[in-house]
Regions:
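Conserved ATP-driven motor cores of ASCE-family P-loop NTPases powering translocation/secretion/packaging/pilus
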Residues: 274-276, 280-315
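P-loop NTPase motor domains
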Residues: 5-282, 298
């Protein structure tokens, strides 16, 4: 009974949180784990309060279950990738959302290898023909090409030649089992994301992710599905990482970040966002059934930092 009451209290709090923030003219990012529960509230509240925004406000949805009711957005837009480190960060978020056990094994050889390989693929798509094909689906498809063709293409670019030297050394040295293991560590998890709906949504540009742009404020709802969370959380984690970097800047509109059931995805940079974004008018609200879930999925150190940095905790 107690846990049920706690859950009901959380639902009421999150609903009221959304209502109050939109009433006050906040831009908003809402991670809706059981879509469309929170998204409906946000949409209806926005209809009543459009006059609270100085500029016309847009409402956008990412919905992998039914693309007919989804906007399209490319989280690997070339404009987001200024350096190969940005490609690495994207690959890092993707891989750790696909393999949450890796969160506590960061730095291990068989964790870093697939991240580095996928980062190289992303960066190649960024520099090839000015990023014409720089999307997450294109990266998955390129990675699944025969590795002899893949490495020949990637290492034809000088800036990727040194980046991939461990793979090339294994290839030229005849360590084929090691090489195939490294490649499979990237290919196998990503193969779960091969989906026409996901591909279509993640290759378009209906809107930009600067949700708190004073000239183009947005309320963005991204929907997960409890039955497919292991698939969708990976893609949604990439949107999260992009938004975190873009909203935490000075001179932006006040903004709300609401993450329902935060343990269900790896939200890179969440601890830093909580600690530093207040001065940039970013309000963060997290929901979880129990703190032990956060420890399980984020690791004890990162979970403790998040818990200790949060200003208010409601049970």
């Amino acid at each position: 009974v107690r846990s049920r009451r706690q859950r009901q209290m959380w639902i009421r709090d999150s609903n009221n949180y959304i209502r109050q923030q939109i009433e006050k003219g906040f831009a908003a990012y809402i991670y809706d784990f059981k879509y469309p529960d929170l998204s409906i509230i946000a949409y209806n509240q926005l209809l009543k309060n459009k006059d609270k925004y100085a500029k016309p406000v847009g409402f956008y949805v990412i919905n992998f279950d039914d693309p007919r009711y989804s906007h399209r957005c490319n989280p690997l837009n070339p404009s987001f990738l200024s350096d190969i480190a940005d490609a690495y960060e994207s690959a890092y978020v993707i891989m750790l959302n696909l393999n949450k056990s890796w969160i506590q094994k960061q730095g291990d050889f068989f964790v870093e290898s697939p991240i580095v390989l996928f980062a190289a693929v992303i960066w190649y798509l960024k520099i090839y023909e000015n990023g014409k094909f720089c999307t997450f689906p294109h990266a998955i498809e390129l990675l699944n090409k025969p590795y002899s063709d893949l490495f020949t293409i990637l290492t034809s670019y000088r800036e990727l030649e040194n980046y991939l030297s461990p793979f090339m050394d294994a290839w030229k040295g005849g360590a084929m089992e090691q090489l195939q293991g490294q490649i499979a560590s990237a290919k196998i998890p990503l193969s779960r994301l091969i989906s026409p709906a996901l591909y279509w949504i993640m290759t378009g540009d209906d809107f930009t992710l600067d949700i708190n742009n004073p000239e183009e404020p947005k309320v963005l709802c991204v929907g997960n599905n409890p039955d497919r969370q292991n698939i969708y959380s990976c893609a949604l984690g990439l949107y999260n990482a992009r938004i975190v970097k873009m909203v935490n800047r000075k001179g932006r509109l006040k903004c709300s970040i609401l993450v329902d059931e935060v343990p269900t995805l790896y939200f890179k940079g969440l601890d830093t966002l909580i600690a530093t974004a207040r001065s940039n008018k970013v309000a963060v609200c997290l929901g979880a059934q129990d703190f032990s879930q956060l420890i399980r999925d984020y690791g004890d150190k990162e979970a403790r930092v998040i818990q200790n940095t949060i200003g208010t905790v409601s049970y």
